[in-house]
């Protein structure tokens, strides 16, 4: 372990947000210090990681903001990793932590990091797993990962979070289709947010009934994140959730599998691949599958 890496680890463990921010940037941007830093981490895997996902417009950021307020009222420290949509052109974040959670940004008990998904499938940023391990090295009591609001494709959150919360809203009724088409399988808890709106009670009842018909014992909690109603009940459910040893093993297996996949893909140069494709695509009978076989057999 180099002196620089040791210094960063010690500062992160002491709660130094500047060192934490730099370490995360190292990982996100594949800085030369990133790999030795990750090898030297001693993450505290007892820190719960809560994934919050759901369709666009469900009020996920407002809900996270309200949870942070309630949690820090207990003088406990929380980290929020907010994964934003990316521009397909510059791969940058289109939103931002200061806009979404400005009210909490100066609270010393809260660390907020926004990162772009950079086109990653499943609603998660490419380096979310590694960054979560960096956060687990700091003295937080809870970590929240809020993912891109793209509905059912956010299944990847299961490979990261100890508990997955799916946030829905009552007004259109279309959210039930989201539940049926994929989110059902990943939720540990459902939140019907914007519960002040018409139809919230019947929507929550319909959702609970559907879950019971499928013999699934998953809580449904109604919240109004703007006014704060239901937030204490939600936080209590989050803090009382018990992760099984089987789930912990599954999470670590998923983590290791993704790291191995990433390591295998590291030598694939996208620009070189594009140049090779540009040359090959003009040949008669071009076949992308044959191209890939030949590309990797070189």
Predicted features, each with a name:
Residues 114-115, 166-169, 191-194, 222-223:
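Conserved beta-strand segments of the P-loop GTPase G domain that flank and frequently precede/overlap
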Residues 222, 233-298:
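Long, well-ordered amphipathic alpha-helical subdomains in the mid-to-C-terminal portions
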Residues 3-50, 55-58, 67-153, 163, ...:
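Nucleotide-state-sensitive switch-loop elements of NTP-binding domains
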Residues 59, 63, 230:
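Conserved glycine(s) of the Walker
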Residues 189, 195-243:
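Canonical P-loop GTPase G-domain recognition
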Residues 76, 108, 160-163, 185-188, ...:
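Short glycine-/polar-rich loops that comprise or flank the Walker A/P-loop
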Residues 94, 131, 156, 160, ...:
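Alpha-helical scaffold elements adjacent to nucleotide-binding pockets in ATP/GTP-utilizing enzyme cores
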Residues 133, 137-140, 153-171, 181-191:
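Inter-motif core of Ras-like GTPase G domains
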């Amino acid at each position: 372990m180099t002196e620089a890496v040791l210094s960063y680890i010690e500062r992160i463990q002491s709660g130094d947000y500047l060192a934490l921010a730099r370490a995360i940037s190292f990982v996100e941007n594949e800085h030369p210090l990133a790999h030795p830093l990750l090898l030297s981490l001693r993450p505290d895997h007892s820190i719960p990681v809560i994934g919050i996902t759901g369709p666009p417009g469900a009020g996920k950021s407002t809900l996270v903001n309200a949870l942070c307020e309630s949690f820090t009222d207990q003088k406990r420290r929380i980290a929020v990793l907010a994964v934003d949509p990316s521009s397909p052109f510059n791969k940058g974040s289109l939103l931002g932590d200061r806009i979404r959670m400005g009210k909490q940004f100066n609270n010393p008990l809260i660390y907020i990091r926004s990162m772009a998904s950079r086109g990653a499938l499943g609603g998660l940023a490419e380096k979310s797993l590694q960054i979560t391990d960096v956060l687990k090295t700091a003295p937080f009591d809870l970590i929240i990962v809020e993912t891109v609001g793209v509905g059912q494709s956010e299944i990847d959150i299961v490979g990261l979070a100890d508990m997955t919360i799916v946030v829905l809203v009552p007004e259109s009724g279309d959210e039930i289709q989201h539940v049926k088409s994929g989110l059902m399988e990943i939720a540990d808890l459902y939140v019907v947010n914007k519960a002040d709106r018409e139809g919230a009670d019947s929507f929550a009842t319909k959702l609970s009934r559907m879950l019971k018909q499928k013999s699934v014992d998953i809580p449904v909690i109604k919240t109004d994140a703007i006014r704060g109603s239901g937030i204490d009940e939600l936080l209590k459910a989050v803090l009382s959730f018990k992760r099984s040893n089987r789930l912990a093993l599954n999470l670590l297996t998923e983590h290791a599998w993704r790291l191995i996949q990433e390591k295998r893909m590291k030598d694939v140069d996208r620009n070189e691949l594009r140049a090779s494709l540009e040359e090959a695509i003009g040949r008669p009978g071009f076949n992308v599958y044959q191209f890939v076989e030949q590309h990797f057999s070189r």
